[in-house]
Amino acid sequence: MTAPIRPQPGILDIALYQGGASKIAGHADPLKLSSNENPFGPSPAAVQAMADAVASSHRYPNTDHADLRAAISEIHGLEADNIICGVGSDEVIHFLCQCYAGPGDEVLYTQHGFGMYPIAAKAAGATPVQVAEDARHVDVDALIAGITPATRLIFIANPSNPCATMIDNGEITRLADALPDQCLLILDGAYVEFADGYDGGKNLVEARDNVVMTRTFSKVYGLGGLRVGYGYGPRHVIDTLNRIRGPFNLSGMALAGAEAAVRDVDWVNECLRVNADERARLVGGLRQLGLACDDSHANFVLARFASEAAADAADAHLKRDGIIVRAPKSYGLPDCLRITVGRPEDNSRVLASLTALVAA
């Protein structure tokens, strides 16, 4: 009798990732504020570029992503040869774990960190190690204390998701200074465009050989449905990651749309301007209702309620009004709701709904 087919150790320990909901029973067209998407969608230039690319769908895309990497390099001042493009920054995170962590190795991430970090670590056979945060902020001292001889990777999202908090460059540098030789620091910059005065780790990456940053086109660029992201790091790391990257991991449409999106600086700047104004209005309105909110450095707000029951009641009330937000219980925040900053009229609906709940 042959042995049963079994997956690799650790695979069945992976909890399925739960994305933001998009449907509510009884509401044909709900307001979705659960996935931190750009409410204005992609740049019109990106939409046109994708439409133009459809006619070439019978052709394989370029394998080196040279045009997209050149556009990223030009707009963001990065070295094109130090960029790797992936199917969202998620794929780059998986590449890093596959290449640099395995059985017997540890991958550190923070208490309320992005759920993909432990998934990618377990998929590579490594052990994810959660490190406590300090009032929903990355705690550098706790991370340094958590480093062991088995530590290979440290992931921090800055700004963080789902908390929207961030630490400054001085704290990030202090963490990088404390890394042992065998350890890589990965700065997840999915929301970095929304954080004023922060380079996402660019200067730190370029000054060291053990720091990598990741970025995505899913947030400010409004291309979550295309799945495009990239990593920026030392040449030796990027060359290693490219060895396991599929040659055609990005479609021709994705490459065309992402290149046009990154080049449409005016569209991006206008989206950022509206987000900053509306974020401040949303935070102010929530605080006036007695809800605690940390200052947000992203395109969403984490509202804290008096209890888990109060958060559940607010979530249910918003759903009855046709509004979907994210209840981040799986992130250890049962008394919170994460609310994407929407269009002005969207945010007005949220505040009106919660005002009615408080007044009831």
From Swiss-Prot:
Pathway membership, UniProt: Amino-acid biosynthesis; L-histidine biosynthesis; L-histidine from 5-phospho-alpha-D-ribose 1-diphosphate: step 7/9
Similarity annotation: Belongs to the class-II pyridoxal-phosphate-dependent aminotransferase family. Histidinol-phosphate aminotransferase subfamily.
Lineage: superkingdom: Bacteria
Listed NCBIfam families: hisC (TIGR01141)
Keywords, comma-separated and alphabetical: Amino-acid biosynthesis, Aminotransferase, Histidine biosynthesis, Pyridoxal phosphate, Transferase
Location of N6-(pyridoxal phosphate)lysine modifications: K219
Enzyme class, UniProt record, top EC level: transferase
Gene Ontology molecular-function annotations: histidinol-phosphate transaminase activity; pyridoxal phosphate binding
UniProt GO BP: L-histidine biosynthetic process
Coiled coil: none
Organism phylogeny: Bacteria, Pseudomonadati, Pseudomonadota, Alphaproteobacteria, Rhodobacterales
Pfam family, one: Aminotran_1_2
Organism the protein comes from: Jannaschia sp. (strain CCS1)
Cofactor section: pyridoxal 5'-phosphate
UniProt protein name: Histidinol-phosphate aminotransferase
SUPFAM superfamilies assigned to the protein according to its UniProt record, in alphabetical order: PLP-dependent transferases (SSF53383)
Assembly and interaction partners: Homodimer.
Stored PANTHER family: HISTIDINOL-PHOSPHATE AMINOTRANSFERASE, HISTIDINOL-PHOSPHATE AMINOTRANSFERASE 2
InterPro entries: Aminotransferase_I/II_large, HisP_aminotrans, HistidinolP_aminotransfase, PyrdxlP-dep_Trfase, PyrdxlP-dep_Trfase_major, PyrdxlP-dep_Trfase_small
Catalytic reaction list: L-histidinol phosphate + 2-oxoglutarate = 3-(imidazol-4-yl)-2-oxopropyl phosphate + L-glutamate
EC number(s) from the headed UniProt entry: 2.6.1.9
